[in-house]
Amino acid sequence: LQVDASAYAGDVVRMLAWAELNPIAQIFDFRPGPLLQPTLAIRIRIEQATPIRVAVQTRDGLWHVGSTQIDAAGGGCTAPSVVRAQAGWEERLGQVQGQRFAQAEGSRLRLQVAHPMDNGLVGGIPEFFLNQAQLRDRSGNTLASLELFPAVSENPTISLDVKGNVETELWLRDNNGNEFKAEL
């Protein structure tokens, strides 16, 4: 899912996304700070064909809503995690791989986090997913916050656009209280 609210650049305070017909509808709640472009890309799971909706709140309190239809064969939310079938996945839990790509007015961060993102819909496997993320500068100031929900794919891939040449780190927490950090 790629969301681009750059038409409202400088005014975006919050972006919400959900999949109407998914068993777990919420996808993310993104709050970009002034040093981030109002863009976000993230891989998600879809159970069946569904409308995807995004609501963008601007400083004036207005919500701007857009949508698209996603066609899917189905089963994405109720399929067991491929990650759990891989030997040693626990040792890689929370590892972040990523790269920074130069752009005209800053850079794009593209990250992948090792995590099964279990949504609790597979028998015998409880919810276990990343639910909080913050992009911070080297001083620890929050540049953006991101609340994630179990509709996000396992080993989630996230792309963010940062203004300027800010050195950053990613902080993550899952619903079991595990915390992870990566310098980017």
Task: Report the location of each language-model feature.
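Short amphipathic, basic-aromatic surface patches that mediate peripheral association
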Residues: 4-7, 112-126
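Beta-strand signatures of extracellular beta-sandwich domains
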Residues: 14-18, 132-136, 171
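Short acidic/polar inter-strand loop motif in beta-rich domains
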Residues: 58-66, 173-182
